[in-house]
Regions:
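Aromatic-rich carbohydrate-binding modules that target alpha-glucans
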Residues: 3, 11-55, 65-88
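Short, structured interface segments
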Residues: 88-101
Length: 362
């Protein structure tokens, strides 16, 4: 007999509602939602455990109690049954992209050829529910690591996504921000000539980061404004990322002023630029020689105190001092937040992204 533990990450707007596992095992109700396993909410997961004989194979689905509210993927499709064969104790972790009875917006793919990068980059684009009605333009939320921001099935690290579409939809329905077009920039698989992953090559200032920032500011934005109804005003554009993505977004703020009006920088990897910034004080020297930050923009920074993030406190403290010295208003034009228990993970960024949006759009 083995213990099978289910650990489910549910959509952020209904994550405290009951979640059930139903499937082809007696402990899961034999496909009867009325007899399914009800999970318990222990933030940020819904959890539950069953016992199963070794060698048993079972299939299962995730619902909110009936087939009308079963889980769907990021595209609104009902996925195939999940399967598990029992040999040892196991923890099955899954992320629900959305529910059938509330799926909203539309997710699509696009590609852009870049002269600057001498290649193509794939885009994942989420259009808000009202996009198909009328001819109005929408603010743009542009995010790095596009494979990780919408769809848990494509998230590179832990099958947990940022729930970017869910956060924007939830906050827009609550009046905390306007509806927006959300675009994720995907990075190619494989390695560069420098033996770095293509993602690290795209974003690192020691490698291709400057060229990638130029691509974003001078090629990608005009493409999006031409092919989608995005608002081209600076104050309507947000650029965001985590880790190296946050660092590249900050580089865009410095090197391409006047383009974006909002920046969401989660777990900014200042220590990853050791060749450029060999110590924390070098960050200030680098800031002093860069073009002045646009005084009219709004910037959100955060870092946790777990894993890689516990290295970032000193850099962020210096950055905050620099901005205040330059006359920036803490809490209004910028904020730097330390997140107790926060780490350098997609799950942690998923929890924190909503706060970034709330601050930047308030």
């Amino acid at each position: 007999m083995s213990l099978i533990r289910f650990r489910i990450v549910s959509p952020i707007d209904r994550r405290e509602e009951p979640v059930f596992i139903t499937g082809s095992h007696e402990a899961l109700g034999n496909w009867d939602p009325a007899r399914a396993l009800r999970l318990e909410w222990h933030a940020p997961f819904h959890t539950g455990t069953i016992e199963a004989d070794t060698g048993v194979h079972f299939e299962y689905k995730i619902t909110r109690g009936n087939w009308e509210s079963e889980a769907v993927d990021a595209w609104g499709h009902v996925p195939h049954n999940a399967q598990h064969e029992v040999w040892l104790d196991a923890t099955l972790t899954r992320t629900v992209a959305d529910w059938k009875d509330r799926y909203s917006g539309r997710l699509t793919h696009d590609r852009i050829h870049s002269r600057i990068l001498a290649g193509e980059r794939e885009l994942t684009v989420w259009l808000p529910p009202s996009y198909g009605r009328g001819e109005g333009r929408f603010p743009l939320v542009l995010l790095y690591d596009g494979a990780n921001v919408f769809d848990p099935a494509t998230s590179a690290i832990s099958n947990v996504d940022w729930a970017a579409d869910e956060w924007v939809d939830l906050l827009a329905r609550g009046g905390a921000m306007p509806e927006a077009v959300v675009v994720g920039i995907c990075h190619p698989e494989g390695f560069s000539e420098d033996n770095a992953t293509m993602r690290d090559f795209d974003l690192s200032p020691e490698l291709g980061g400057a060229a990638f920032a130029q691509f974003v500011a001078t090629e990608l934005l005009p493409y999006l404004d031409q092919h989608y109804r995005t608002d081209a005003r600076q104050e309507a554009r947000l650029l965001g990322g985590a880790g190296l993505g946050a660092l590249n977004a900050f580089h865009v703020a410095l090197a391409h002023p006047g383009v974006f009006g909002k920046f969401a920088c989660l777990s900014t990897s200042f220590e990853d630029v050791s060749q450029v910034l060999p110590d924390q004080s070098a960050l200030l020297r680098a800031l002093e020689v860069e073009p002045a930050l646009d005084k009219g923009v709004r910037m959100y920074f955060d870092h946790g105190d777990q894993g890689l993030d516990e290295c970032y406190g000193g850099y962020h403290a210096l950055l905050g001092g620099f901005l205040r010295e330059k006359g920036w208003q803490d809490g209004r034009e910028f904020t730097i937040r330390q997140i107790p228990g926060g780490g350098h993970t997609e799950l942690s960024w998923r929890e924190r992204f909503g706060e970034a949006l709330r601050f930047l759009f308030r």
